[in-house]
Curated annotation (Swiss-Prot):
Its main location: nucleus. Residues 1-20, 77-99, 213-306 are annotated as: Disordered. The modification Phosphoserine is found at S7, S9, S11, S13, S16, S264, S270. Specifically interacts with EBV EBNA1. The EBNA1-EBP2 interaction is important for the stable segregation of EBV episomes during cell division. Interacts with WDR46. This is Probable rRNA-processing protein EBP2. The modification N-acetylmethionine is found at M1. It is found in: Nucleus, Nucleolus. It comes from Homo sapiens. The modification Phosphothreonine is found at T3. The gene is EBNA1BP2. Residues 274-306 have a biased composition (Basic residues). It holds the Pfam family Ebp2.
Length: 306
């Protein structure tokens, strides 16, 4: 006869009943404390089963000769220049600082050296060869495929470093190029401003030459210094002022130099009669040249033809 499956509520009630029973048993044994609803497990006790350990050791222990085992237990070799017998060490005090990498590696090296010095004579007595034959092929610990991968990885890393270095150099060159370009543009602007100032000075008569047209290749600072020095040394009116004085006179009061005096009134040496009566102003022309007849004459001539 098949029993119907239990519902979720019935299964939860059975689990709760089992849990309650366990809690009651634990409480009766004194494993529960006030405020706890979980059984606390006590700390595990360490068992030192000496007989069991010896039995396990006897199962895999083999009495082999030393040449098959090649085990030695030695201390480090004495340091160079020190006493041959190793100095007694205190067990409580460590001879080598484990945090010092150099001392730790040197202790490994000295201990291996002591083992080699102690084992080689025994191997020679047992006639065990300690040197490899000339045709011995020693296979590497790592395969060629793995070494090839390591080589490719190193090459990739080196190529990445070279690309990074080239990128740094290109950035530095671009930065330097921008700096040089900016300096060139500033120099051109300064030269242009100097040229415009020279043109303005030439137009106003402050200068009688244009340096940039004469191919003056001196630096701008020297030209400015020379121009300022020339202006300080130059005395007298400018070229523009001299031209205007020549054309229009000096202007202002002439101190009576052009007033009529007795001497100037009596001086008739420069008098010309033809010029005074207007005869000298006429231009000589061809005598008997044909002139256009007047309006009435032209009308009479026209009526005659009709």
């Amino acid at each position: 006869m098949d029993t119907p499956p239990l519902s979720d509520s019935e299964s939860e009630s059975d689990e709760s009943l089992v849990t309650d029973r366990e809690l009651q048993d634990a409480f009766s044994r004194g494993l529960l404390k006030p405020g706890l609803n979980v059984v606390l497990e006590g700390p595990k006790k360490a068992v030192n089963d000496v007989n069991g350990l010896k039995q396990c050791l006897a199962e895999f222990k083999r009495d082999l000769e030393w040449v098959e085992r090649l085990d030695v237990t030695l201390g480090p070799v004495p340091e160079i220049g020190g006493s041959e017998a190793p100095a007694p060490q205190n067990k409580d005090q460590k001879a080598v600082d484990p945090e010092d990498d150099f001392q730790r590696e040197m202790s490994f090296y000295r201990q291996a050296q002591a083992a080699v010095l102690a084992v080689l004579p025994r191997l020679h007595q047992l006639k065990v060869p300690t040197k490899r034959p000339t045709d011995y092929f020693a296979e590497m610990a790592k395969s060629d495929l793995q070494m090839q991968k390591i080589r490719q990885k190193l090459q990739t890393k080196q190529a990445a470093m070279e690309r990074s270095e080239k990128a740094k150099q290109l950035r530095a060159l671009r930065k330097y190029g921008k700096k040089v370009q900016t300096e060139v543009l500033q120099k051109r602007q300064q030269e242009k401003a100097h040229m415009m100032n020279a043109i303005k000075k030439y137009q106003k008569g402050f200068s009688d030459k244009l340096d940039f047209l004469e191919g003056d290749q001196k630096p701008l600072a020297q030209r400015k210094k020379a121009g300022a020095k020339g202006q300080q040394m130059r005395k007298g009116p400018s070229a523009k002022r001299r031209y205007k004085n020549q054309k229009f006179g000096f202007g202002g009061k002439k101190k009576g130099s052009k007033w009529n005096t007795r001497e100037s009134y009596d001086d008739v040496s420069s008098f010309r009669a033809k010029t005074a009566h207007g005869r000298g102003l006429k231009r000589p022309g061809k005598k008997g040249s044909n002139k256009r007849p007047g309006k009435r004459t032209r009308e009479k001539m026209k009526n005659r033809t009709h």
